[in-house]
Amino acid sequence: MTLSDLRDYFKSDFPWKESISVGKIDKNKERAVCFYHSKVSRPKINTIGGKGNRSYTVLPISILLRFGKNYEAAAEKAEEIYNFFDEKTFDLNNERVFVISPYNAPIDLGTDDQGVFENSLEFDLYITKKGD
């Protein structure tokens, strides 16, 4: 599974009509969401017998949300996206995905230089092949 696959899943199942990207957010837009590989360190998964015996992989992701200059609206939208993903299970590209956040809520990042509120949403995607 790639971040583009996840972006496309979000685009098809969540009511979001604003800017959406992978790897680089459009800072010219007041409303935008971007999917990144997480920079938060996670422990390595070791499997007895090697990677071929592993039944799942973990993909840590970060979602950056820019959502206008109203704090309440930005916090509400961040919570909506958080609730859309947290503790969710879905199938994508012949893989089963289990989503867990290491945090209890979105992370409020404050505003950028233009006064646009930003939130970070952190998730770990546990991915198994369907049938495993």
Predicted regions and their residues:
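Short N-terminal helix-initiation segments at or just after the protein's N-terminus
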Residues: 1-11, 61-72
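Small/polar-rich, solvent-exposed N-terminal microdomains that initiate assembly or binding
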Residues: 1-51, 88
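Short hydrophobic/aromatic patches at helix-to-coil boundaries
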Residues: 3, 7, 127-132
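Short, solvent-exposed beta-strand/turn "edge" segments of beta-rich domains on protein surfaces
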Residues: 49-55, 112-116
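Oligomerization/assembly interface segments of phage tail-like spikes and tubes
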Residues: 55-69, 117-128
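Mid-chain, well-packed structural core segment of small domains
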Residues: 67-90
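Acidic-leaning, charged glycine-interspersed low-complexity segments
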Residues: 85-130
